[in-house]
């Protein structure tokens, strides 16, 4: 019998956290007063979690960052990094979970990707009871990785 293996936590990052994090990098040194920037730095430097996203989420990231006048080179580099390092999903639509229809892609991605967490600055938009994913604010400890579904099903046999 094989021993179940844990995995890195899997998470979805709301656009609000990405924007707040990037603003922390603009000022140079990432300070402890910007937990969104710390989350991004930790993911870039230490791969602290598996970032889950979809094409729809990538499009939103890109549109919001451009609207906020983040340099095109910065936006391009970030999108390329996410395409290379994150797990890109095609979740489809889940139905109405969030009170904000713009947040539905994040909910659908979290559910389809078996996310351990969804990190946001707007927790009211992501009702904890409607999601199987833990909703976190930046700076809260990330949950530890769970057993993979494949390994969990092996254990039950």
Where are the regions a protein language model picked out?
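Active-site neighborhoods of divalent-metal-dependent phosphate/nucleic-acid chemistry enzymes
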Residues: 84-119, 123-124
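Residues that scaffold the ATP/ADP-binding catalytic core of kinase and kinase-like folds
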Residues: 20-22, 64, 129, 144-145
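Short, well-structured N-terminal submotif of metal-dependent ribonuclease cores
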Residues: 1-51
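Acidic, PIN/NYN-like endoribonuclease modules and their adjacent C-terminal/linker elements
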Residues: 104, 117, 123-157
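Short secondary-structure boundary segments
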Residues: 15, 55, 121-123
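Short, active-site-adjacent cap segments at secondary-structure transitions
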Residues: 18-19, 59, 125-127
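PIN-domain endoribonuclease scaffold, especially VapC-family toxins
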Residues: 40-97
């Amino acid at each position: 019998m094989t021993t179940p293996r844990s995995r890195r936590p899997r998470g979805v990052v709301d656009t609000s956290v990405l924007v707040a994090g990037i603003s922390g990098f603009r000022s140079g040194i990432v300070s402890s007063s910007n937990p969104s920037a710390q989350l991004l730095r930790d993911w870039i430097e230490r791969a602290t979690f598996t970032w889950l996203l979809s094409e729809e989420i990538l499009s939103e990231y890109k549109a919001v960052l451009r609207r906020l006048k983040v340099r095109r080179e910065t936006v391009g580099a970030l999108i390329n990094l996410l395409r290379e390092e994150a797990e890109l999903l095609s979740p489809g639509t889940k139905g109405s979970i969030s009170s904000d229809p713009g947040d539905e892609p994040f909910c659908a991605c979290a559910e389809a990707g078996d996310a351990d967490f969804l990190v946001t600055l707007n927790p009211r938009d992501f009702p904890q009871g409607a999601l199987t994913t833990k909703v976190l604010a930046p700076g809260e400890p990330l949950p530890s990785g769970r057993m993979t579904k494949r390994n969990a099903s092996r254990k039950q046999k």
